[in-house]
């Protein structure tokens, strides 16, 4: 949620920033509501002053033994008017708040302006894509041929965009997740968390999935609970309505969870394989940072994700998302895209974002300055560290051999019981 004072004092600044996102949001809606709310509050204060004056006159008349019925009747009318205006002001405030919950975050000044993914800016590339002596296959062919990925039975169990992992594939998925977690905990200082996989509406609102993107979520209708689309949701909301201590910042949490997405609007995209699933495993990184150091934390988090890819020997590139391609809650985002030789292109495997105080305002997450003073909103960050299924895809495609086998990256072999090569 944006700062109410910023919207009130500099609506034109907000309008310009949102225009960078190519948003059709009309700031005049907020201005109209805010003007009405302020007018109502002013009228209420004036009537309260009148009520106090009338109360004093009633008391004076009674002390003098005079008839105060007319004054009492006028006092009752004023009180009823105040009550009605209070209700109207509350309704306007609620409408204003609902409007603010649909407004995306403002892009940071370092974010390139653009409309969509075609305007994203490449920052760097790491690793050289392997030169194959044969035509590399796509992961779904490799996985099925080796007896590890079963899309047919998954379709029988659940439908499209689901996968059954067998034998080595199930173990490789688990190995990747454990390797990611162990690295984040031991090398990067994160605290591991195992959160609920379904959350309430308030929690989804805190991180920005609701109210605008409900169609992207899986909802348990009878309970009004939602399956999490990412562990960012429960991890960030762990400190909702709390005041942290400045000395405890930054805080870093990591979790391995299933993620559930309806993929609304993705009809016809990535219909084969593991790239776009209704259920997938991801290891998430979430950080709570001091406002003055959140962009340092963004670079650090990006480095944590990059190191995983480097240790796996997977070529990748880093891009800065343009203003029109960023997620709703982000003020700046880096995407890491891994090279997939079977598809002959880079595909997203991690997204690392600084959300500034946007989520903290929605979830009411603050910190107490070390020197005392009024609590301030923290800055929240989140990043994939990494998407497990997509990393499995990258391993299969980059380490495939001409005979159909797949070499297991060295860092994963301890998690695979020493297995060096996957064969049928």
Curated annotation (Swiss-Prot):
Residues involved in ATP binding: 261-263, 348-351
Subcellular location: Cytoplasm
Enzyme class: ligase
UniProt: L-serine binding residues: 230-232, 284, 384
Ranges in coiled-coil conformation: none
Main location: cytoplasm
Record-level Gene Ontology MF annotations: ATP binding; serine-tRNA ligase activity
Annotated EC: 6.1.1.11
Record pathway: Aminoacyl-tRNA biosynthesis; selenocysteinyl-tRNA(Sec) biosynthesis; L-seryl-tRNA(Sec) from L-serine and tRNA(Sec): step 1/1
Reaction catalysed by this enzyme: tRNA(Ser) + L-serine + ATP = L-seryl-tRNA(Ser) + AMP + diphosphate + H(+); tRNA(Sec) + L-serine + ATP = L-seryl-tRNA(Sec) + AMP + diphosphate + H(+)
Any one biological process term the GO annotation gives: seryl-tRNA aminoacylation
Key word Protein biosynthesis present: yes
One annotated Gene Ontology cellular component of this protein: cytoplasm
Superkingdom of origin organism: Bacteria
Disulfide bonds: none
Protein role: Catalyzes the attachment of serine to tRNA(Ser). Is also able to aminoacylate tRNA(Sec) with serine, to form the misacylated tRNA L-seryl-tRNA(Sec), which will be further converted into selenocysteinyl-tRNA(Sec).
Domain comment, as recorded: Consists of two distinct domains, a catalytic core and a N-terminal extension that is involved in tRNA binding.
Family stated for the protein in its record: Belongs to the class-II aminoacyl-tRNA synthetase family. Type-1 seryl-tRNA synthetase subfamily.
Subunit structure: Homodimer. The tRNA molecule binds across the dimer.
Name this polypeptide is given: Serine--tRNA ligase
Annotated source species: Nitratidesulfovibrio vulgaris (strain DP4) (Desulfovibrio vulgaris)
